Each structure stands twice: as structure tokens, then as C-alpha cells.
Amino acid sequence: MKRTFQPSVLKRNRSHGFRARMATKNGRQVLARRRAKGRTRLSVSK
């Protein structure tokens, strides 16, 4: 049986990367929440 997680850096960054987050209002809210919480890594790409 094929596993569900087939890693790809490109797909990962396109959907969850910093620029993808900045592209939408909700994505910016995600980053703001993570900054407020004090996360070292705001997104997977950064």
C-alpha cells in the first residue's frame, strides 16, 4: 500500500510557505498569531 505522505519541498512551500501565507488576509492572520505566540519559525519555508 502506498503511504499518504509523499514529501515534496516545492509543494510544501507553495501551500504552507511564507509567501503563500502573506498572499492572503487569513494567511497574514496566521503569521500574526504565530508572532504573538512567540514562534521561532513562522512558516515551514522561513
Swiss-Prot record:
Gene Ontology MF term list: structural constituent of ribosome
PROSITE patterns listed in its UniProt record: RIBOSOMAL_L34
GO CC annotation, single: ribosome
Swiss-Prot/TrEMBL keywords: Ribonucleoprotein, Ribosomal protein
Cited InterPro entries: Ribosomal_bL34 (IPR000271), Ribosomal_bL34_CS (IPR020939)
Pfam family, one: Ribosomal_L34
Keyword Ribosomal protein attached: yes
Any one of the GO BP annotations: translation
Xref: Gene3D superfamilies: 1.10.287.3980
Protein family according to the UniProt entry: Belongs to the bacterial ribosomal protein bL34 family.
Protein name stated in the entry: Large ribosomal subunit protein bL34
Organism, as annotated: Pectobacterium atrosepticum (strain SCRI 1043 / ATCC BAA-672) (Erwinia carotovora subsp. atroseptica)
Gene encoding the protein: rpmH
